[in-house]
Amino acid sequence: MIFKEILEINGLNVTNMKKQFFATIIGLSITLNGLAYLGPNDKKGGGDETPKGANCSPATAKLTMEFNDVSAFIEQGGSMLQNRQEGTPAYEVPKGSNLFAIYAGALWMGGTDVNGQLKLAALRYRSGNDFWAGPLTVNPGTGDYNPLYPVGDGVRRDFGEANIDPDQCQAYDKFYTIRKAEVVAFNIWFECNAGIATEGCDDIEAPSNDVLKRIYGWPAHGDVSRGQDYFLAPYYDRDEDGNYNPDNGDHPWYDDILGRDDVLCQVDRRVTLYGDETHWWVFNDKGNIHTETTGDPIGMEIRAQAFSFATNDEVNLMTFYNYELINRGTQTLYDTYFSQYLDCDIGNYSDDYVGCDVSRGLGYTYNGDLVDQSDGGTNGYGENPPAIGCDFFEGPYQDADGLDNPGPYLDSITNEMVIPEISDAINNNGIVYNGIGTGYSDDLIDNE
């Protein structure tokens, strides 16, 4: 495994930068499941199987995130931030300004099988397709994951043939949108109606039909008769019966509402919902032949979230993305890389530069001079143009090694940061920068 977890960054120094904003593509948090599993078919010569039922049509669902001061275009089939139909950028910030900071983006992933054969799924401008809508098939009981209980590093998700039929690709070619405020209001209304709460119930209104439709239509479960994982989108199971039923108070799962803190991030790897507004969808790399990269499929199921917050600070100019990557096949993926591909264009694309802040794990794009001119129909940002950054807040967990890997930590006695030696960090899979990982030198083993 290659990625290390990345901490939230504070952004570039924007002091004295008049009329500037700093927009950041964030979230890019990734949870991996099952990539270290050696399946029963993971043997020499086992990497050339022809996918069954892999004849899906390209995904067509689209949406525009515009909950805060960013307008960001997302497609179900893995591409993002680009209007492919018009060949124009589609990450507008500030919203409504007709100024764009990103031309295109996508998720990239790849690795090798036991024979050293490359498995690859990626997009640039989506001239072809490497991703299709929907969850992949599994053999129930091959894993030990149960979302009712905290999940550690040893958990394994169900795996199997990792296939999908065209009608299921079509059925999941959509986004599921929910807002945290809607879930909070539903909780309060339910508890008042059920007699669980009595105070403050006099003025409680029932959720609208639209809100109830989103909550009752939440894709909490896959179709096990089609070989899908029973547990799909995150949901809060109020009565802990393992089944999603809003009549019993179940709802899409934000774990930080109403004083709850259901998931301790340092030790619990369950994925909940994030943001004030959340768009959830599921896609895969097995629905058909890879025509963008021509790479061999992995058998990866990707559960994605695009989310944002409405605030009065810089976060109002940011968007966030979370990917839960689940290897549904029986083959282990080695030497694995994941990346967020971005083609950033700060207004006029002809005068931009890219850079990397190593200590923060931050990649950024900025204008080459102090004025971003308009050119050839592309609007420039003018004087004091902005920069835009891309950061992994949380990357994949490191492979378990039985160590609390070394990293910077705050000495409780001296109140000073203690930085490990570079040689110690290298030899023990640690880090030397405080901004590029979590779980290091925290007295907990294998949570890095």
Where are the regions a protein language model picked out?
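Bacterial Sec-dependent N-terminal signal peptides
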Residues: 1-41
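A long-range scaffold signal marking pre-active-site subdomains of enzyme folds
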Residues: 37-448
